[in-house]
């Protein structure tokens, strides 16, 4: 076969774009996910991995992707089987029902004559509140001594919600930092402008203005000195703007990577390790073909 008749294979999918951040980059900086590769070597099946070998991207992007994916999926919960999880939930529910029924019957038998002052009956007459707390919270005892203490207590379910809200504040952290950075720089610029203006006011301003008559009346040395000051001021402003633009670009890039990673996690939720437990549980009910 002649050299002119030889075919060249072209990969149409090779567009030098990171699959995580969706930004164009050099081909040498792209590689497959090293975290999924190490998990595969440890024995994790390919169906449970987040990325395949065909997915290319930056090393930092893959690390941030797995960091976000592992925030809500702890290894302690993943190690439990489906039967253990269901057994724990059912046992908690049954124990809570038994405790609630026992406390309710004891209070009704001991204080049935005090209908107007009974905490349980007063609690039932408030339809805007829930009659039953969450099943995994501590069962309240409806007695005259314990009503004052239980009124201000917070259930463990509410505490977990508050902790979850504190952990998910990272989504607004970047925006707050950017806003604080902008307000800090703006206030600092105003302070420098106020301090630079002395008692004369018109001569030592940040951006002085000179008329044509004033410039014509200056000597050559004064004009050269004024030009040097203006060039120095322009250089300082340029460096400050460059620094602000670089910080803004870095914050925007990090925020973009987080948003793209969250969107892909929502789209590929079936591949998350925390959902593989339920999938294996449903497969166990299927009949096996011998």
UniProtKB/Swiss-Prot annotation:
GO biological process: cerebral cortex neuron differentiation; positive regulation of dendritic spine development
Keyword Coiled coil set for record: yes
Tissue expression summary: Expressed in brain (at protein level). Expressed in neural progenitor cells and postmitotic neurons of the embryonic cerebral cortex.
Keyword terms of this UniProt record: Coiled coil, Differentiation, Neurogenesis
InterPro entries: EURL_prot
Coiled coil: 228-251
Superkingdom classification of source: Eukaryota
Phosphoprotein in keyword set: no
Chain residue ranges for the region called Disordered: 185-206
Entry function: Plays a role in cortical progenitor cell proliferation and differentiation. Promotes dendritic spine development of post-migratory cortical projection neurons by modulating the beta-catenin signaling pathway.
Quaternary structure note: Interacts with CCDC85B.
Entry's family note: Belongs to the EURL family.
Protein name: Protein EURL homolog
Source organism phylogeny: Eukaryota, Metazoa, Chordata, Craniata, Vertebrata
Gene field: Eurl
């Amino acid at each position: 076969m002649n050299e002119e008749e030889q075919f060249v294979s072209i990969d149409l999918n090779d567009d030098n774009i990171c699959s995580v951040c969706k930004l164009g980059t050099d081909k040498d900086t792209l590689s497959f996910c090293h975290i999924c590769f190490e998990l595969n070597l440890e024995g994790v099946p390919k169906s449970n991995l987040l990325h395949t070998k065909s997915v290319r991207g930056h090393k930092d992007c893959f690390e941030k992707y797995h960091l976000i994916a592992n925030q809500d999926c702890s290894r302690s919960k993943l190690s439990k089987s489906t039967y253990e999880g269901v057994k724990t939930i059912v046992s908690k529910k049954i124990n809570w029902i038994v405790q609630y029924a026992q406390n309710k019957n004891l209070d009704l038998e001991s204080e049935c004559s005090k209908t107007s002052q009974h905490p349980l009956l007063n609690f039932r007459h408030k339809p805007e509140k829930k009659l039953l707390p969450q099943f995994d919270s501590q069962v309240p005892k409806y007695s005259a001594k314990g009503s004052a203490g239980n009124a201000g207590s917070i259930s463990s379910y509410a505490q977990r919600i508050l902790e979850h809200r504190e952990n998910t504040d990272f989504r607004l952290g970047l925006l707050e930092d950017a806003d604080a950075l902008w307000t800090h720089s703006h206030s600092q610029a105003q302070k420098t402008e106020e301090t630079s203006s002395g008692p004369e006011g018109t001569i030592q301003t940040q951006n002085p203005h000179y008329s044509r008559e004033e410039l014509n009346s200056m000597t050559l040395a004064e004009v050269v000195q004024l030009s040097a000051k203006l060039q120095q001021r322009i250089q300082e402003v340029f460096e400050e703007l460059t620094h602000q633009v670089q910080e803004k670009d870095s914050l925007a890039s990090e925020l973009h990577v987080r948003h793209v990673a969250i969107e892909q996690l929502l789209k590929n939720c079936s591949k998350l390790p925390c959902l593989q437990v339920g999938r294996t549980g449903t497969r166990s009910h299927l009949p096996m073909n011998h």
